[in-house]
Amino acid sequence: SNDVVEVSKYSALYAAKKLNKPVIKSDVGYYIEELGGFPGPFLKYINDMLTSKDILNMMKTKNNRKIYLKECLTYAEPNGFTKEFINVEEATLATKEAGNGSTFDKIVIFEGDNHPKSLNSEKENLKHFKKVLVIYDECAKFLISK
């Protein structure tokens, strides 16, 4: 599946059944609108196989530079029960790479920023991370109420 929610759910369920205990699994996907949602949940593979320049070359004739960052945190039980917590952030692809880091760190500009993630200060990264933590808070509340 190209849907990070389905990947997370499948992985969590597989692990819960294999271990015979509840598990929590997180998966992340980056979806470039102009490239039909590429690379989707295949981020690790893309980071190993392509450079930031490769991605920018794919985008050189494209006007829409929107990219969606989708994280799914899945709680799964061996009996098949799952609960998903999803965060989606809109970002923009830069026109040139900058800084150090992963393939996408050098070219993804978070909403409200004017430079790629790789150039963020610790304070800016913390601001972004707080948005992502919402799904972890939701998961914690769910587990407490269970």
Segments (PLM) and residue ranges:
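Anionic-ligand binding patches
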Residues: 1-146
